[in-house]
């Protein structure tokens, strides 16, 4: 788990394209405004340009996403400026990826699209029809998928592959979870107001965001201020609609700057200064403290009790036949059929004699496609057919539990947590340096 607060950000490309909602009035207004500017160059990025048409297409997708989330849509000029900055960063990274010789072949793109279709319980042609019904051109969707895969490979090459975590860091992390002072640890319930200002944003944008955050801080510190209402109306985080309530958090799960700030506060007090985090500025209020609910525990893993039905492809059974048979079985199970009986009758896995029961499995044990699908299911829910190297599966989750895990599993969890934290900071630094070394000319007026 990342040791940073999770904040809202304007989505791009593939993520935004997945939203199923009719265009909002704001999106329609954006299209109308952009029509006359369609071919105007709104940014120069090294030897490339971004046009008004490209910008408006992306803005329209994001406006729909915000509406779907019932989040406020920023004023048109502000949203266009934010999205353009993201597109600039994306374009710079694509250029770097090409310079590095990074390519994503068609087979990889098609495999990714197939997984997306499968996750939505559809064949690829059905998924394509849904995307186009949302007003998203399929070629744009495919292009965004290719771009995201390319940028993922670039980040792996330039940043993630260079992150190291020492055994000493792992030992220190585990000790902090169950060390000699663990019994006196307290969980913290916090509320926050977040103003977005990524470290890699232009300095002018950061200055505007800081000015806004300072104004909100003064309002939050004022006598009689309603922090919850202020967060609902002004915070740019996903939890704004909940008044910025983060719930109870252990100190180990929070950025060190936040922990240091609230350590000096009494319940009900607002930290008197802004806290700079990688994505922006934080205003934090301590709601209450309580004794840690599990202060001496080792890092936990979540085990899943799962069963499945496997149909192998080949030996007279085609891909479509295996998938359709599982769709039919799932339909019968959803109508009251017994999963265990179907598994005993049809499954081609060794677990068939146990009704498909795989017992309690830990993270990393099943193949990735199986684990990803399993992790999306609620208790009792049956998946759509899932393709793995073994064939097609129907998966049913029977329950979940926290477990201490083996010493090696605890070390793996600690190493992953430390690595993710380091990688996020390293990526932010690398992206800022990449932008600083690029020629960027913004021709779109900056929203104030």
UniProtKB/Swiss-Prot annotation:
Keywords: Chaperone, Isomerase, Periplasm, Repeat, Rotamase, Signal. GO terms for biological process: Gram-negative-bacterium-type cell outer membrane assembly; protein folding; protein stabilization. It is found in: Periplasm. Residues 1-27 form the signal peptide. Its EC number is 5.2.1.8. GO terms for cellular component: outer membrane-bounded periplasmic space. It catalyses: [protein]-peptidylproline (omega=180) = [protein]-peptidylproline (omega=0). SUPFAM superfamilies: FKBP-like (SSF54534), Triger factor/SurA peptide-binding domain-like (SSF109998). It comes from the Bacteria. Residues 185-288, 301-399 form the PpiC domain. Its main location: periplasm. InterPro entries: OMP_Chaperone_SurA, PPIase_dom_sf, PPIase_PpiC, PPIase_SurA, SurA_N, Trigger_fact/SurA_dom_sf. GO terms for molecular function: peptide binding; peptidyl-prolyl cis-trans isomerase activity; unfolded protein binding. Chaperone involved in the correct folding and assembly of outer membrane proteins. Recognizes specific patterns of aromatic residues and the orientation of their side chains, which are found more frequently in integral outer membrane proteins. May act in both early periplasmic and late outer membrane-associated steps of protein maturation. The PPIase activity resides only in the second parvulin domain. The N-terminal region and the C-terminal tail are necessary and sufficient for the chaperone activity of SurA. The PPIase activity is dispensable for SurA to function as a chaperone. The N-terminal region and the C-terminal tail are also required for porin recognition. PANTHER family: CHAPERONE SURA. This is Chaperone SurA.
């Amino acid at each position: 788990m990342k040791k940073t607060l999770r904040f809202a950000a304007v989505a791009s490309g593939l993520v935004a394209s997945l939203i199923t909602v009719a265009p909002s009035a704001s999106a329609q207004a954006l299209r109308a405004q952009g029509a006359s500017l369609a071919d105007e160059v709104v940014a120069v990025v090294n030897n490339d340009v971004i046009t008004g048409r490209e910008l408006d297409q992306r803005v329209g997708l994001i406006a729909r996403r915000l509406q779907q989330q019932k989040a406020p849509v920023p004023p048109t000029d502000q949203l266009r400026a934010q999205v353009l900055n993201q597109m600039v960063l994306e374009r710079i990274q694509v250029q770097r990826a090409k310079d590095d010789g990074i390519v994503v072949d068609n087979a990889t793109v098609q495999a990714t699209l197939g997984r997306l279709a499968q996750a939505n319980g559809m064949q690829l042609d059905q998924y394509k029809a849904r995307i186009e019904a949302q007003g998203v051109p399929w070629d744009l969707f495919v292009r965004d998928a290719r771009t995201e895969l390319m940028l993922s490979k670039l980040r792996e090459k330039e940043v993630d592959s260079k992150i190291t975590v020492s055994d000493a860091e792992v030992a220190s992390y585990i000790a902090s979870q169950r060390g000699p002072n663990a019994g006196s640890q307290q969980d913290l319930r916090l509320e926050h107001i977040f103003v977005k200002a990524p470290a890699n944003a232009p300095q002018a944008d950061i200055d505007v965001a800081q000015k806004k955050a300072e104004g909100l801080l003064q309002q939050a510190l004022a006598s009689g201020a309603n922090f919850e209402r202020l967060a609902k109306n002004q915070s740019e985080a996903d939890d704004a609609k909940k008044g910025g309530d983060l719930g109870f958090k252990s100190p180990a799960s929070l950025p060190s700057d936040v922990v240091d700030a609230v350590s000096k506060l009494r319940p009900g007090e607002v930290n008197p200064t802004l806290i700079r985090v990688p994505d922006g500025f934080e205003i934090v209020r301590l709601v209450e403290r309580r004794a840690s609910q599990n202060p001496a525990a080792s890092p936990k893993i979540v085990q899943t009790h799962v069963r499945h039905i496997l149909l192998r492809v080949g030996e007279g059974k085609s891909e479509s036949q295996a998938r359709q048979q599982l769709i039919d079985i799932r339909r019968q199970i959803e109508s009251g059929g017994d999963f265990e009986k179907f598994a005993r009758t049809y499954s081609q896995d060794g677990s068939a004699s146990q009704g498909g029961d795989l017992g309690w499995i830990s993270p990393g044990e099943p193949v990735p496609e199986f684990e990803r699908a399993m992790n999306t299911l609620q208790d009792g829910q049956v998946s759509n057919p899932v393709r793995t190297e073994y064939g097609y599966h129907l998966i049913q989750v029977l329950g979940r539990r926290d477990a201490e895990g083996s010493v090696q599993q605890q070390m793996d969890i600690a190493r992953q947590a430390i690595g993710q934290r380091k990688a996020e900071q390293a990526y932010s630094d690398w992206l800022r340096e990449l932008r600083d070394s690029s020629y960027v000319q913004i021709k779109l007026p900056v929203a104030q």
